[in-house]
């Protein structure tokens, strides 16, 4: 089920849980929400995999042009794209060498049809939620 509390808690509290997050639409500008969220999650011990059409490295990690180019397993695909781009992102997810566990659509990113399709494909879907805010909530911290 979309936004299932157990899925969110399992992702963000698990000691051995997901550690690799592909961030689709990650900006190299420190003032952008995608950069701030990715930098925070990196600080919390997650490996960030930037997926964006330009740049060579972001947050010290090599940039991939598409999800399908990533040669190693990814636990979470975190989407910072406008809702109309979600079906194309999901199509890219389906081309990945290793199926991720989660499709996370950030705050303001809502696409019910693509979310339902992602669930049918076997992904756990979190929609219209901020990864950083949810991390803070699950760990009992006030979001800054």
Regions found by a protein language model. Give the residues of each.
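Glycine-rich, highly charged phosphate/nucleotide-binding loops
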Residues: 1-7, 57-72, 78-90
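Hydrophobic, well-ordered beta-alpha structural blocks that scaffold small-molecule cofactor pockets
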Residues: 1-54, 59
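Structural motif
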Residues: 20, 75-76, 102
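Short, acidic/turn-prone active-site loops that include or flank metal/cofactor-
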Residues: 55, 107-110, 129-133
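Short, charged, surface-exposed secondary-structure boundary motifs
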Residues: 58-61, 75, 113-116, 134-141
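ADP-ribose/adenylate-binding Rossmann-like module
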Residues: 96-118
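Active-site capping/gating segments
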Residues: 122-144
């Amino acid at each position: 089920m979309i936004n299932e509390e157990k899925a969110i808690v399992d992702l963000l509290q698990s000691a051995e849980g997901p550690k690799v997050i592909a961030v689709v639409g990650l900006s190299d500008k420190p003032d952008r929400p995608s950069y701030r969220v990715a930098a925070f999650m990196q600080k919390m011990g997650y490996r960030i995999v930037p997926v964006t059409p330009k740049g060579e490295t972001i947050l010290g990690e090599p940039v991939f042009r598409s999800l399908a180019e990533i040669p190693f397993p990814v636990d979470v695909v975190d989407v910072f794209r406008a809702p109309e781009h979600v079906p194309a992102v999901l199509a890219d997810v389906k081309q990945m060498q290793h199926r991720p566990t989660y499709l996370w659509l950030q705050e303001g990113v809502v696409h019910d049809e693509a979310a339902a399709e992602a669930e049918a494909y076997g992904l756990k879907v979190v929609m219209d939620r901020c990864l950083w805010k949810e991390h803070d909530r699950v760990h009992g911290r006030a979001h800054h």
